Amino acid sequence: MSLPSRQTAIVNPPPPEYINTKKSGRLTNQLQFLQRVVLKALWKHGFSWPFQQPVDAVKLKLPDYYTIIKTPMDLNTIKKRLENKYYEKASECIEDFNTMFSNCYLYNKTGDDIVVMAQALEKLFMQKLSQMPQEEQVVGGKERIKKDIQQKIAVSSAKEQIPSKAAENVFKRQEIPSGLPDISLSPLNMAQEAPPICDSQSLVQITKGVKRRADTTTPTTSIAKASSESPPTLRETKPVNMPVKENTVKNVLPDSQQQHKVLKTVKVTEQLKHCSEILKEMLAKKHLPYAWPFYNPVDADALGLHNYYDVVKNPMDLGTIKGKMDNQEYKDAYEFAADVRLMFMNCYKYNPPDHEVVAMARTLQDVFELHFAKIPDEPIESMHACHLTTNSAQALSRESSSEASSGDASSEDSEDERVQHLAKLQEQLNAVHQQLQVLSQVPLRKLKKKNEKSKRAPKRKKVNNRDENPRKKPKQMKQKEKAKINQPKKKKPLLKSEEEDNAKPMNYDEKRQLSLDINKLPGDKLGRIVHIIQSREPSLRNSNPDEIEIDFETLKASTLRELEKYVLACLRKRSLKPQAKKVVRSKEELHSEKKLELERRLLDVNNQLNCRKRQTKRPAKVEKPPPPPPPPPPPPPPPELASGSRLTDSSSSSGSGSGSSSSSSGSSSSSSSSGSASSSSDSSSSDSSDSEPEIFPKFTGVKQNDLPPKENIKQIQSSVQDITSAEAPLAQQSTAPCGAPGKHSQQMLGCQVTQHLQATENTASVQTQPLSGDCKRVLLGPPVVHTSAESLTVLEPECHAPAQKDIKIKNADSWKSLGKPVKASSVLKSSDELFNQFRKAAIEKEVKARTQEQMRKHLEHNAKDPKVSQENQREPGSGLTLESLSSKVQDKSLEEDQSEQQPPSEAQDVSKLWLLKDRNLAREKEQERRRREAMAGTIDMTLQSDIMTMFENNFD
């Protein structure tokens, strides 16, 4: 069988039926919730598109789909079934949802994209399903049954008269409730600041009183949402011509009971939502080790606690609290907290204080109290508004019930009474909404008063200085406009649910673009993004903002849209700033400016190179200390210094040659002066005067280059960090010769400072400067001199330019301090002491080895010549015995030790030194390592601050 014939063999079955031909479905409050809330939310989700239509096996080339999946299901079929009243109860609809998800999991593999999408949808489905009303009640059931009774009566009695009367009655009764939503909802839209809970309560209580005699009509959508009527009974299916008073009397008690039920299901405040989050936190797995005893009620029989219920009168546990929370039995957060605290008090009351369960209860109570303290308080105005609306609604319902009960049986009189009653209701509702507006304007007035008080002081100044400060008036106008704009923004949180419903879901490309835009934002803007997410996502509200993990797939569409607005606004501001700074210039001007800058830099570099070569040719007099006895090999230079010196040697061989040929006497080099600045006060004063003409032209070169200040500051900071990082490897030269270890380190630091100053000068220049002669001598031995006549002829005429200029620069002391190294006297002293101690130990070791060697030789000699030893033993006066030989050797070693231990610094016993040698060595090694670590992390902050102030002053 060929491939095309196989494809044609795949046939899609007919879609599932959505009209119930066997039995007529009914409409319940739970089915309404599934249709209006659950299905709507799933349909709007970004992952719902594969589930919105039946699976097309032909298009997707899935020949075995309908052989594996026996009962296919999709969202469109469920939607049609809900619209056509296919279901009798909500459990059938929920079963269809579960079938749709299980089909996806059955046919596809666990890691597929479609499975991940189905899991996300199922998670949303379960979240919405948890908000569904607990009790299922039929909506509009009375009307259907009474219509059937009317039709039976019409068939049995006069066929023409009674149907016409029934139709008239039904038509008249439909007119009045249809007007109710317009009357009740129009003023509610005017005052949106009242909480939605109070509105729903007032609607329920008002419409109950008016709807006494309109029970046989179909309820409108607003009434169906607010009140859920009980299923019809046989007593209510009596003939139509029953007196109105009996109907009203019978319906008073059930209606009042139903009102309380509706209030319980509707009244879910923000605090109770937080309480449910706290309960979930307490039942989480991370609290399992100390929360498990409180999950279920105490089983006194199984645990053998026969007197438990005598001591504990009101037992409580987390399972009972969760059941109450699911059934919405808590009116406010304080009832919830009272039950939780009662559970802990029962534990403390029954168990002894040192019991294990008491400790577990205390840890769990700490978790509860910590989270409960973070619950925000309810606004006082909304509570007042609730009380006002409920009181007025109760009064209206009493009046309406009394008027309805005292009404006549005739339909004309009842209609007139209804019209009058509705007019009264309209007036009273308007009065209530006016009170709500007054209450809502109270905080705004307080804010205005605060703003006025803060603005009084600048206003007084303006009266005195009207002519001096005319620019302040437009600023005040802007502030007033901002205040007016900010006032209506406070009403936005009440419309969050509408925004969430109306927000357009984001596709994959939009989410990817949003994540890229967020990454472009600076760090100070990210805090606002975290605040937006936490304020709109209840699951992330209690999370730590520093360690928050955000998944765009779990965020609501309204949150993503709000983030998109904020990010776009920030990026617009950033894009406008550089455009304002740009100045339009022609290409020729830019080229000419670049040429001028390059010429300036080349001139500065050449001048400074010539001056440096003059000074390096002068003989540098550095006093070298006498070499100590056994010098260990010095460690290799740091990588930064070595690489820098190689670069400068390779790049400036010709420059150094020209400088060596044309030498002049009379001044010392910059590196020697800066290196010996900290050794003595006399030399520091003379060297600072010599180093000034070298360092200052460098800075003028930087200024002439017109580099931006940020780059200069970064360069200087990097140079200072390099200097401080170079201190650690320099401090490791503690085992160097003891004569003058401080001078070597200071010379290397001075050379490094001059090298970094040259790097800051020539960042944009073409040539690089060579190091001074002393610096090369310290790092790489004696400098190699290359002579060339061409470089002499080129650079000699330009050498006189910087000598004639008299340059004055601010904060010269800060630049002097750059040449001075950081003091490391403590480290160097300790290194000298360490070297002396190591030297002592080595000498002692040599002495001991010598004595042992002599003893060994004598013993071997005696073993080889036994005759000599016997003769010596027989003639004690004539020869030496072994004892005398050993005693002589010991005497010699003691004399040597005493001669070596004669100085006061070595006045310790040899035996104690040998015992404590290993311990002292380990201790000193550890101390040295710690000192090196401490010195590696130190940074001269005063040096950095001086450099920063210098740059700021010169760029002003």
Curated annotation (Swiss-Prot):
A motif (Nuclear localization signal) lies at residues 208-219. Testis-specific chromatin protein that specifically binds histone H4 acetylated at 'Lys-5' and 'Lys-8' (H4K5ac and H4K8ac, respectively) and plays a key role in spermatogenesis. Required in late pachytene spermatocytes: plays a role in meiotic and post-meiotic cells by binding to acetylated histones at the promoter of specific meiotic and post-meiotic genes, facilitating their activation at the appropriate time. In the post-meiotic phase of spermatogenesis, binds to hyperacetylated histones and participates in their general removal from DNA. Residues 496-578 form the NET domain. It comes from Mus musculus. Residues 210-239, 391-420, 442-508, 607-747, 859-934 are annotated as: Disordered. It is found in: Nucleus. Signal peptide: none annotated. Disruption phenotype: Mice are viable but males are sterile, producing fewer and morphologically abnormal sperm. Aberrant morphogenesis are first detected in step 9 elongating spermatids, and those elongated spermatids that are formed lack the distinctive foci of heterochromatin at the peri-nuclear envelope. Spermatid nuclei show a fragmented chromocenter. Its main location: nucleus. Residues 625-640 have a biased composition (Pro residues). Residues 417-442, 844-940 form a coiled coil. The lineage of its organism: Eukaryota, Metazoa, Chordata, Craniata, Vertebrata. Interacts with SMARCE1. Interacts with mRNA splicing machinery proteins SRSF2, DDX5, HNRNPK and TARDBP. Interacts with the acetylated N-terminus of histone H1, H2, H3 and H4. Interacts with P-TEFb components CDK9 and CCNT1/cyclin-T1. Ubiquitinated in a SPOP-dependent manner, leading to proteasomal degradation. Residues 392-409, 649-688 have a biased composition (Low complexity). Testis-specific. Expressed in germinal cells from the early meiotic (pachytene) spermatocytes and during spermiogenesis in the round and elongating spermatids until the condensed late spermatids. No expression seen in spermatogonia. This is Bromodomain testis-specific protein. Keywords: Activator, Bromodomain, Chromatin regulator, Coiled coil, Differentiation, Meiosis, mRNA processing, mRNA splicing, Nucleus, Phosphoprotein, Repeat, Spermatogenesis, Transcription, Transcription regulation, Ubl conjugation. One of its GO terms (molecular function) is histone binding. Bromo domains mediate interaction with histones that have acetylated lysine residues at specific positions. Bromo domain 1 mediates binding with histone H4 acetylated at 'Lys-5' and 'Lys-8' (H4K5ac and H4K8ac, respectively). The bromo domains also recognize and bind a subset of butyrylated histones: able to bind histone H4 butyrylated at 'Lys-8' (H4K8ac), while it is not able to bind H4 butyrylated at 'Lys-5' (H4K5ac). The modification Phosphoserine is found at S186. Residues 859-874, 915-934 have a biased composition (Basic and acidic residues). Residues 26-132, 266-375 form the Bromo domain. Changing V55A: Abolishes interaction with histone H4 acetylated N-terminus. One of its GO terms (biological process) is sperm DNA condensation. Residues 216-231, 714-724 have a biased composition (Polar residues). Residues 445-463 have a biased composition (Basic residues). The record marks N108, D113 as: Histone H4K5ac binding.
